[in-house]
């Protein structure tokens, strides 16, 4: 995620006192942004990546949904992961309250968007990274949207109910 997009999420996070943040798909933005939240929960499918990010993002709670697929070589791991429904990963938030900020930047983004709608706090914001991918768009219908585009054309959609 580019700095301009991280800056937009940071601005939203800083506008709420002690926000509760949910992030599907962790990474460098988790490390940077989790310092600014009251509670930060990151959901991940790669145990190797979850461990690496957790070491750097001490303010975040990282929950890994290990699918039991060997992570090396990486391209085979990614191909196998695409075939799985990842229901626990997608549905985890349903039983865990509401969130002020939700970042969708991992696997199964369209399905995660559907869940995000149901667990978004009143006045909350959903961010969808790489929103230029048309197969995510149906999951965003009916939400208010602001589009942020970085210098490479990647889109971050900022949405609310």
Where are the language model's segments positioned?
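Exposed alpha-helical structural elements
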Residues: 8-11, 88, 139
